[in-house]
UniProtKB/Swiss-Prot annotation:
Residue ranges, annotated region (Ribosome-binding): 120-134
Cytoplasmic side: 756-791, 829-836, 1308-1320
Disulfide bonds: 297-306, 381-487, 384-389, 454-468, 516-633, 909-984, 922-964, 923-966, 928-948, 1134-1146, 1176-1252, 1181-1256, 1203-1246
Protein's UniProt name: Structural polyprotein
MF GO annotations: RNA binding; serine-type endopeptidase activity; structural molecule activity
DNA damage as UniProt keyword: no
Top-rank lineage group of the source organism: Viruses
InterPro entries: Alpha_E1_glycop, Alpha_E2_glycop, Alpha_E3_glycop, Alphavir_E2_A, Alphavir_E2_B, Alphavir_E2_C, Flavivir/Alphavir_Ig-like_sf, Glycoprot_cen/dimer_sf
Residue span of region Disordered: 17-41, 65-125
UniProt-listed Enzyme Commission number(s): 3.4.21.90
Ranges of Basic residues composition bias in the record: 73-86
Domain notes: Structural polyprotein: As soon as the capsid protein has been autocleaved, an internal uncleaved signal peptide directs the remaining polyprotein to the endoplasmic reticulum.
């Protein structure tokens, strides 16, 4: 195969050169001659061909600049017909012909009649021809690297195509490179406008290009021809009218299709890039010395093109020995795939037209035909419908990822292959019969079953892919030539799914995707998609199937391509083992005794653990159709439930068609995470806390809710019984505590009053009125005469009252200000001594300079502490400076990032046992090798936990594959080791154990001053100084270094877990870490540690096998009861990123900020508005709702200007704004948030303050989807009526207590002076 390919236009240019006759002669018809057989290509022939190709390339390069020759051949001259003369009217022939055409186009009514064209193929050819006229090759270092296309008024080419356009007028033009796409454009000379193509809009339909059709659907461009290659970058994509809709950039495989990356255009020449992530730019590298590239394989010291060997020597059906030798000699060649396809398909010069022209279907046919390089085999099956047997469909291995239901099985037969090894239908099965011959059967009714019938997805060669339900055994059954065969083996099929949020089957109606692992069904040309085959083992057959004897004449029937071997003993000769390889042979033997017949296939087959160990030399490699790969899988997104609010709860209701996971977590320090699988009809009530809660329904985006203010039945502004109902529902603990204390005090007061009354009635009788009461009584009486003092009285009135009534209290109140005045006067008295050096001309001059400098650099500083919660409302403030217009300031947290410092200790995955086929020593002893890694099954694999045992007294007198005739002298070597599963190379199937040392916390804060936005990055370990537009911002450090990650974490797929994993080298069977490695070579790690509990057992004597047990994968067991991932349990609402390992948007901590605003940012007021006569009316109010209150403020403005409006009351935010003030009456309507049923806030407008007060109604909704700006009700609020009732009750109790205390004192005093009355 030569690398140089001619396009159609090149052929057209070279037609005159290759034509045998001149242009004016008629060329006779030449029938197709038989294709000449190609001679064997040697080194001398390759050199000669290289020289010829170099000369031919130079000739073609010279022809490229010449004028284009009409491709139409000479017209055939019609004999016996004279040429028509010109008409007598004197018209020229051209004018007459033009006139006739115009008349033909017009109908009877003068309308143009358009001919219908039923030749779509011709339209395609015309469009491609038009595209060729506007397409020019681009040469780079002597080779075509791509193409450039003239479209509209510009010439376009991909930016990755280097070189000059092969046209004198376009060679030196300068291109402009697009910023956001792989495209270059330039203007071309006006003389070439006739060659430019018209643009058209690329839509979802089928288009044309050089090699066939291109299908566009949902921004996915598929090359239906599959013939695109390097060097095609820049080729035009046209519609049937010849208009260009795009140019090709490159392509790549997408399953069985070829997907393209293109630049699409529209009618206005606007370009857009439709990229495919796995596409490779189709630019061609420069040729090296213009020599053809030949992919070389070797055979008998001769080199040849791997994809085109001489079919006389290579065809595996004609010369199987030569073909197998050729495959064996080129096993390590990187182009072995091409050689394998060539020797098994044996393509001729003319192929039969296939029904399906799909490249994928043709490629599948080649893959099936490649199985002709191997033969099927028979192996031991432990259960063939109740008994053990040697079965043609014996199950050798079963592979499962453990995370889904798909199984990959390997059997001894070959699916989709004919008896000779060619490609067959899906129901065909190639197998090795009991007679040692290879057969093929159609309509085999292949069935795979576990606990129920499996869905067979695909069967290629020895491998079957099926979707099976879980079970403890696996059965494969097929009908072969009318006989039903089945094989059952023990296999524990369990599905251990990783963390998932939905368990759907077929409900993938969304565009959401995620990385997943599956078995690849698209073979690729790489070593990963090949499997080794070894020398075939002999199978035992009955002697009558291969030898027939008549008296002393015996005939041996040898199946084609096999070797027959048996023991022969004649009458007068000793016993001997004879071998026959030809088709039919005859020998003479008197009284023959023929035993131990066996047939060995000439072609190799796969190594099987159910057969004894055979040859160790790899004979060939055949396709391995289903290796695991990481793919992008679509996932379902469950419909959201109906969400309603009831008090401070969220109600979810609906019907789930399949299991959906509902997870909740609080957004505070204690996440209190919950998870529940829901299916069918459901109704769930979820309480919402003031800190917030996060709900995640299936694969939908998380939803956040906050409880605003809880409310209750009853009335907070009514009588005591309604107050009791309200507060009992709202704050039951406080309400019942208050009722209990009040009842207790009343009971105590009542008891004391009763006791006092019973004692006083005797004292009053014995004592007369005391005109000089004791001082305590007088003092108690004087308390009633003390004037009351209100808290809202002026300070001077209070001082005057204290001076009049209590000199001691006055002195205490006056001591602090007097001390302050004394300190100030003392400092002023000594000020002259401190400032003496500054008095004078120098001092005053320096002072003036400092004052001037300070005045020039003066700025305004605003400080604030911002909570580090991106979900929190932004901080808003109005900056009021005397003499300047107000400025609005907004600060919000854009995101937070917690980045831990990690170290990968090891990775783990599913461990599997690898078994060396049994080494059987018949009538002799065998032993384990000193280096177990030299065993063939362990070669090329990373192994650990290797066990090798020698078993004696095995297989006594066993006939079959072992051929042991001894009873007790037979021995067997059994070797088993642990290795990594083939799924370990996929990221989603591998768990990584990290140790976390420290974490860095970063946040981005957006500061908006007026219309200017400044982004500041703040850190936990220092102060950040940033400058915006005339702003200087000093922020940080963040007040906490909180991290949701523990010291040990595990990452698997897209989830992260806090888990205390075992150290490296300390794994135990069946637990996390039973397979450990640190190497980045996941297929063959050189530091593998494994312990899967392998135990080698004594084999039973019914068949040759290796008996062992092991523990199932510890990773799969850990996934069964794994803790919840951090994406569910992380506190503070952290979002967890697995790769890289980060925690995002954690709502914890705060950051102090200082913002220096220069005077230049402020606008000086020319006149102060001086608002006066302020009045505020609360129009409406709902408490517990963001900006649920509305207020109207009226005031009089003395001058026009600007004023900032904001709230001075903590906990009652006002929608801050800057208002325009006009001279005269002004009205401002604003909103505020109130957390309580009664609101009283002070509003400041340009240093004028007005008080707004009113009553609020309960909110309609008590759960909100955004974090409220007002403070949540902590439970300590008591309404005004409740306070008055409570104050009245408490005051009454206090008065009663004081009265009782006075009575008690009076009684006590009276008792001390009472007169005892003695009856006479």
């Amino acid at each position: 195969m030569f690398p140089m390919q001619f396009t159609n236009s090149a052929y057209r240019q070279m037609e005159p050169m290759f034509a045998p006759g001149s242009r004016g002669q008629v060329q006779p018809y030449r029938p197709r001659t038989k294709r000449r057989q190609e001679p064997q290509v040697g080194n001398a022939a390759i050199t000669a061909l290289a020289n010829q190709m170099s000369a031919l390339q130079l000739q073609v390069a010279g022809l490229a600049g010449q004028a284009r020759v009409d491709r139409r051949g000479p017209r055939r001259v019609q004999k016996n017909k004279q040429k028509k003369k010109n008409s007598s009217n004197g018209e020229k022939p051209k004018e007459k012909k033009k006139k006739q055409k115009q008349q033909e186009k017009k109908g009877s009514g003068g309308e143009k009649v358009k001919k219908t064209r039923n030749r779509p193929g011709k339209e395609v050819r015309i469009s491609v021809k038009c595209a060729r006229q506007s397409t020019f090759p681009v040469y780079h270092e002597g080779a075509i690297s791509g193409y450039a296309v003239l479209i509209g008024s510009r010439v376009f080419k991909p930016a990755h195509v280097k070189g000059k356009i092969d046209h004198p007028e376009l060679a030196d033009i300068k291109f402009q490179v697009a910023e956001d796409m792989d495209l270059e454009a330039a203007a071309y000379p006006k003389s070439m406008r006739d060659q430019a193509a018209e643009p058209a809009t690329m839509m979802d339909r089928v288009y044309n290009w050089e090699y066939g059709t291109i299908r566009v659907e949902d921004n996915v461009i598929i090359d239906a021809s599959g013939r695109g290659k390097p060097g095609d970058s820049g080729r035009a994509i046209t519609d049937n009218s010849g208009k260009v809709v795009g140019i090709v950039l490159g392509g790549g495989p997408d399953g069985r299709r070829t997907r393209l990356s293109v630049i699409g255009f529209d009618k206005k020449m606007k370009a857009r890039e439709i990229a495919y992530s796995d596409a490779i730019p189709w630019t061609r590298a420069p040729a090296l010395l213009l020599l053809p590239m030949v992919i070389v394989c070797t055979y008998n010291s001769n080199t040849f093109d791997c994809s085109k060997p001489s079919c006389q020597d290579c065809c595996i059906t004609a010369e199987p020995e030569k073909a197998m030798t050729m495959l064996k000699d080129n096993l390590n060649d990187p182009n072995y795939w091409d050689l394998l396809i060539a020797v098994t398909t044996c393509g001729s010069a003319r192929r039969k037209r296939a029904v399906s022209t799909s490249p994928a279907a043709f490629y599948d046919t080649q893959i099936l035909a490649a199985h002709a390089a191997a033969s099927p085999y028979r192996a031991y099956c432990p259960d063939c419908d109740g008994t053990a047997c040697i079965s043609p469909i014996a199950i050798d291995e079963v592979v499962s990822s453990g995370s889904d239901h798909v199984l990959r099985m390997r059997v001894g037969s070959q699916s989709g292959v004919t008896a000779k090894g060619g490609a067959a239908g899906e129901t065909s099965l190639r197998y090795l019969g009991r007679d040692g011959k290879v057969h093929a059967a159609d309509n085999t009714r292949l069935v795979v079953r576990t606990t129920a019938k499996c869905d067979v997805l695909q069967a290629t060669g020895h491998y079957i892919l099926a979707n099976c339900p879980v079970g403890q055994s696996l059965t494969v059954a097929a009908t072969l030539d009318g006989t039903r065969h089945q094989c059952t083996t023990v296999f524990e099929h369990q599905v251990t799914e990783k963390f998932t949020r939905e368990r759907s089957k077929g409900h993938h109606l969304s565009d959401m995707t995620k990385k997943c692992t599956r078995f690849s069904t698209t073979p690729k040309k790489s070593a990963l998609y090949l499997v080794d085959v070894y020398d075939a083992l002999p199978i035992s057959v009955e002697i009558s199937t291969v030898v027939t004897c008549s008296d002393s004449q015996c005939t041996v029937r040898v199946p084609p391509g096999t070797t027959v071997k048996f023991d022969k003993k004649c009458k007068s000769a000793d016993s001997a083992t004879v071998t026959f390889t030809s088709d039919s042979q005859t020998f003479t033997c008197e009284e023959p005794v023929l035993t131990a017949a066996s047939i060995t296939q000439g072609k190799p087959h796969l190594r099987s653990a159910m057969l004894p160990s055979g040859g160790k030399e790899v004979k060939a490699r055949i396709p391995f159709p289903f290796p695991p790969e990481t793919a992008t899988c679509r996932v379902s997104v469950a419909p959201l439930p109906s969400i309603t609010y009831e008090e401070s709860d969220v109600l979810l209701a609906g019907t789930a068609k399949y299991p959906v996971l509902l997870t909740t977590r609080n957004l505070g320090f204690h996440s209190n995470a919950t998870s529940e699988w829901i299916q069918g009809k459901y109704l769930r009530r979820i309480p919402v806390t003031p800190q917030g809660i996060e709900l995640t329904w299936g694969n939908n985006a998380p939803m956040h809710f906050w409880s605003s203010v809880r409310y209750a039945s009853g009335d907070a502004d009514a009588y005591p019984w309604e107050l009791l109902v309200y507060h009992t529902k709202h704050h039951p603990e406080y309400a019942w505590a208050f009722v209990g204390v009040a009842c207790g005090l009343l009971a105590i007061a009542a008891c004391m009053f009763a006791c006092a009354c019973s004692r006083v009635r005797y004292s009053l009788v014995a004592n007369t009125f005391n005109s000089n009461p004791p001082p305590l009584t007088a003092l108690t009486a004087a308390l009633c005469c003390i004037p009351g003092a209100r808290a809202d009285q002026p300070y001077l009135d209070i001082i005057a009252y204290l001076w009049t009534n209590s000199k001691v209290a006055f002195g205490l109140q006056f001591a602090a200000p007097v001390a302050c005045v004394l300190i100030i006067t003392y400092a002023l008295r000594h000020c002259r001594l401190c400032c003496k050096s500054f008095l004078g001309v120098r001092g005053w001059s320096a002072l003036l300079v400092i004052l001037a400098y300070v005045q020039s650099c003066k700025s305004y500083e605003h400080t604030v502490v911002v909570p580090m919660d991106p979900r929190a409302p932004s901080y808003e403030a109005v900056i009021n400076r005397n003499g300047y217009d107000p400025l609005k300031l907004t600060i919000s947290v854009n995101f937070t990032v917690i980045s831990p410092t990690t170290a990968l200790e090891y990775w783990t995955c599913a461990g599997v046992p690898i078994v060396e086929p049994p080494h059987v020593g018949c009538c002799t002893s065998v032993s384990c090798p000193s280096d177990l890694s030299t065993l063939h099954a362990f070669t090329g694999k990373a192994v650990s936990d290797v066990h090798c045992d020698v078993h004696t007294n095995v297989y006594p007198l066993l006939w079959g594959a072992a051929h042991c005739f001894c009873s007790t002298e037979n021995t067997q070597v059994s070797a088993v080791a642990a290795t990594v599963s083939e799924f370990c190379a996929q990221d989603s199937e591998r768990a990584e154990a990290f140790s976390v040392h420290s974490s860095s916390v970063t946040a981005e804060v957006l500061v908006t001053l007026g219309e200017v936005v400044t982004a500041v990055h703040v850190y936990v370990d220092g102060v950040t100084s940033a400058r915006g537009t005339d702003l200087k911002i000093v922020a940080g450090p963040i007040t906490t270094d909180y991290s949701p990650f523990d010291r040990k974490v595990v990452r698997i797929g897209e989830e992260v877990y806090n888990y205390d994993w075992p150290p490296y080298g300390a794994g135990r069977p069946g637990t996390f870490g039973d397979i450990q490695a640190r190497s980045t070579n996941y297929v063959k790690p050189n530091d593998l540690y494994g312990d899967i509990g392998i135990e080698v057992l004594q084999p039973t004597n019914d068949h040759v096998h290796v008996a062992y047990t092991y523990t199932t994968s510890g990773l799969l067991r850990w996934l069964q009861d794994a803790p919840k991932p951090l994406s569910v349990t992380a506190p503070h609402g952290c979002k967890i990123s697995a790769n890289p390992l980060l925690a995002l948007d954690c709502g914890v901590g705060a950051v102090p900020m200082s913002i220096n605003i220069p005077d230049a940012k402020f606008t000086r007021k020319l006149k102060d508005p001086k608002p006066s006569a302020l009045k505020c009316v609360v129009d409406s109010c709902e408490y517990g709702v963001d900006y649920g209150g509305a207020a109207t403020i009226t005031y009089e403005g003395h001058e026009a200007g600007k004023c900032g409006i904001h709230s001075l009351t903590p906990g009652v935010p006002l929608r801050t704004s800057v208002v325009e003030v006009v001279a005269g009456a002004n009205t401002v309507k604003t909103t505020f948030s109130s957390p309580t049923p009664e609101v009283a806030l002070e509003v400041e407008i340009c240093s004028a303050i007005v008080k707004c007060a009113g009553e609020c109604t309960p909110p309609k909704e008590h759960v909100v989807a955004t974090r409220p700006r007002h403070g949540s009700d902590p439970g300590g609020y008591i309404s005004g009526p409740a306070m008055r009732w409570a104050g009245g009750i408490v005051g009454t109790l206090v008065v009663l207590f004081l009265i009782l205390a006075v009575i008690y004192c009076v009684v006590k005093k009276c008792r001390s002076k009472r007169i005892r009355i003695v009856k006479s």
